[in-house]
Curated annotation (Swiss-Prot):
The modification N6-(pyridoxal phosphate)lysine is found at K267. It catalyses: (S)-4-amino-5-oxopentanoate = 5-aminolevulinate. It is found in: Cytoplasm. It is an enzyme of class 5 (isomerase). It comes from the Bacteria. Its cofactor is pyridoxal 5'-phosphate. GO terms for molecular function: glutamate-1-semialdehyde 2,1-aminomutase activity; pyridoxal phosphate binding; transaminase activity. Pfam families: Aminotran_3 (PF00202). This is Glutamate-1-semialdehyde 2,1-aminomutase. Belongs to the class-III pyridoxal-phosphate-dependent aminotransferase family. HemL subfamily. The keyword Cytoplasm applies.
Length: 428
């Protein structure tokens, strides 16, 4: 496809924006070439600056579960915009969105709105430390919980793509309070908790890892975390920024039957606008200012446009059979990709949890970050480029998930599988 306009825009952007992008993975550094500059989106499709149309499996990195420009969301935004863009004061929209979250996720009794997933996880960690009076946070290798200093340790997402273990600018005194353990290794967590459990404020984990590629939990892993946190008086934080309202109506915790103490949200609850939230048990959440001593604030928190888009989105998700339909579409995609790879004779594995999918160019079952890194990155890069050339838009990193939306049709999924078969046939 002709992408000269996107290439020119990228060069122009690099004059004014570090690396030409406002989030590192968008630069396409790990797959070569330059990023597409997007002009418009509709349903399951995006259109770049050169007018090329693509079936989109990035979905703005997860929020667009209904597809782009869903009419209910557009209507809600227009109505909210007519009243203003930001007030710096409470609105009824904040209460309604919070109510929808609380109704859908039983572990959440109160919720605080913020502006991003990073703000949500950062605030939840501060709250956990304030509530427990402890300092240590446990996370998992390849688990990306935003770019807050405390959590940018052995992270996935763009950090994995860049091969940076953390980031310059984070003092050792900060990272010293964060312990990172192999994901899905319950025995390793038991050993660490046996030694340091009385100093651990919280364990933070994604119900389904999404930034080392999509990696599901092994059986019993989350149950082990819940048991250990209860035993040692630590809080279990589920980072559901990606999985929240994506893998099931009740989010990851509802799907797996686990009750965390705190939960972080983002992406879908804002309907495509900047938003984040964290919530949990009443007695914990009431430690947040002004109800309690743990401080957190934000000029644009509870922004009325984001709240309106989020309300419209969560209301649409209540439709009977919504998640069953999404799951079936995603299963169709994943099965088709596996079949295409098998026919091509290449090393490949793919899986999904709800409408969140992942693939690796390896025959091994991937259960942690070290195993994810054994994927053939050269083949992934060739696959990404080949698919883009055929009108299929995937995340430009091996260490990201694919997202299917309600707007994707079976015909589009079949076209995606056919394109994949064509590309895979040419891979070594």
């Amino acid at each position: 496809m002709e992408t000269t306009r996107s290439e020119a825009l990228f060069k122009e952007a690099a004059k004014f924006i570090p690396g030409g992008v406002n989030s590192p993975v968008r630069a396409c550094g790990s797959v070569g070439g330059s990023p597409l500059f997007i002009q418009k989106a509709e349903g399951s499709k995006i259109i770049d600056a050169d007018g090329n149309v693509y079936i989109d499996y990035v979905g703005s990195w997860g929020p667009m579960i209904l597809g782009h420009r869903h009419p209910d969301v557009v209507k809600a935004l227009i109505e909210a915009l007519a009243s203003g863009t930001s007030f710096g004061a409470p609105t009824a929209l904040e209460t309604r969105l919070s109510q929808l979250v609380v109704e859908a996720v039983p572990s959440v009794e109160k919720v605080r709105m913020v502006n991003s997933g990073t703000e949500a996880t950062m605030s939840a960690v501060r709250l956990a430390r304030g509530y427990t009076g402890r300092d240590i946070i446990i996370k998992f290798d390849g688990g990306y919980h935003g770019h807050a200093d405390t959590l940018l340790v052995a992270a996935g997402s763009g950090v994995a793509t860049l091969n940076i273990p953390g980031s310059p600018g984070i003092p050792e005194s900060v990272s010293a309070h964060t312990l990172s353990i192999t994901y899905n290794d319950g025995e390793a967590v038991k050993r660490v908790m046996a030694e340091k459990g009385d100093r651990v404020a919280a364990i933070i984990v994604e119900p389904v890892a999404g930034n080392m590629g999509m990696v599901p939990p092994v059986k019993g892993f989350h149950e082990t975390l819940r048991t250990l946190c209860t035993k040692h008086g630590a809080l279990l934080i589920f980072d559901e920024v990606m999985t929240g309202f994506r893998v099931a109506k009740g989010s990851g915790q509802g799907l797996f039957g686990i009750t965390p103490d705190l939960t972080c949200f983002g992406k879908i609850i804002g309907g495509g606008l900047p938003v984040g939230a964290y919530g949990g048990r009443r007695e914990i959440m009431d430690q947040i200012a002004p109800a309690g001593p743990v401080y957190q604030a934000g000029t644009l928190s509870g922004n009325p446009l984001a709240m309106a888009a989020g309300i419209a989105t969560l209301e649409a998700l209540k439709k009977t059979g919504f998640y069953e339909s999404l799951d079936a579409k995603t299963e169709r995609l994943v099965t088709g990709l596996r079949t295409a790879a098998e026919k091509a004779g290449i090393d490949f594995t793919a899986s999904h949890v709800g409408s969140m999918a992942g693939m690796f160019f390896t025959r091994a079952t991937v259960t942690n970050f070290d195993e994810a890194k054994t994927s053939d990155l050269v083949n992934f890069s060739k696959f990404y480029t080949g698919m883009r050339d055929r009108g299929i838009y995937l995340a430009p990193s091996q260490f990201e998930a694919l997202f299917v939306s309600a707007a994707h049709t079976n015909d589009e999924i079949d076209a995606t599988i056919a394109a994949a078969a064509d590309v895979m046939a040419g891979l070594v």
